Amino acid sequence: FFDFIESYIFGKNRTIIDKSNINDNQYVDWASGSFLMILVEVYERIGGFDEHYFMYCEDLDLCRRIHSVTGEKVFYINEVKALHFAAHNNRRLFSKHFLWHLQSIIRYCLISKY
């Protein structure tokens, strides 16, 4: 949560990973919701995306529930690429996107006991 606040106040985000340095397939904590592949059985077992999230943190929550409910892990495959044209409208302090993002982070922290 404090990394999120710091990224807005001071403009730096220590949680971003330089993906150009990742050359191996590996297990990760979570993956972006803009490009996920999930077995239908796993998706249905966890109840899909939590519709109480709006635009932000739904992918973190989904990956956390996959692991906690099924024991499955999220796996990053280096050879698979996708291009996501993200607008990043959540970067302006106190914009509606910022507030949605903040709301989702608070929800995620409370639900996951982060």
Regions found by a protein language model. Name each.
Residues N21-N23, D29-G47, H52-V80:
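A short, conserved alpha-helix in the catalytic core of glycosyltransferases
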Residues D61-Y114:
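Active-site-adjacent helix/loop segment of glycosyltransferases
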